[in-house]
């Protein structure tokens, strides 16, 4: 019996004492006024969702232009009394070229394969607008 080995993706980030974030060997992002770790988590969820949609769309011969937004609620969970993200609403607006008849299928694959969303305890609620 042949066993398959899963791909492994490893990531690293550094934050200096001034709050600047750096990808080792890559670009640096200055600390943005008003941005909390909670905002960054929601931004990561939107970015990952768009990137996942783009990946699946390109595999079927489409280019993607997309934007998105997310809103989240953090409060004490009833299950364990810890503060956590208990609701995440994501809206993605995307345009495919050429247009795709199976946009709902692409959106479903994007939701499934966004590892940020898959890593959360709460299941994000998505609203896809794909044309």
Q: Can you say where each PLM-predicted feature lies in the sequence?
A:
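Extended beta-strand/beta-hairpin segments
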Residues: 1-46, 50-131
């Amino acid at each position: 019996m042949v066993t398959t080995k899963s791909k492994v993706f490893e990531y690293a980030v550094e934050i200096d004492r001034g709050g600047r974030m750096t990808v080792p060997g890559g670009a640096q992002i200055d600390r943005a006024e008003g941005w909390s770790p909670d905002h960054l988590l929601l931004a990561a969820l939107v970015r990952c969702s768009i990137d996942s949609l783009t990946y699946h769309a390109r595999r079927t011969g489409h280019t993607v232009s997309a934007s998105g937004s997310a809103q989240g609620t953090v409060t004490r969970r009833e299950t364990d009394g810890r503060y956590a993200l208990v609701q995440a609403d994501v809206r993605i607006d995307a345009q495919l070229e050429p247009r795709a008849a199976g946009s709902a299928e692409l959106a479903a694959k994007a939701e499934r394969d966004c590892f940020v969303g898959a890593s959360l305890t709460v299941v994000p609620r998505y609203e896809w607008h794909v044309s």
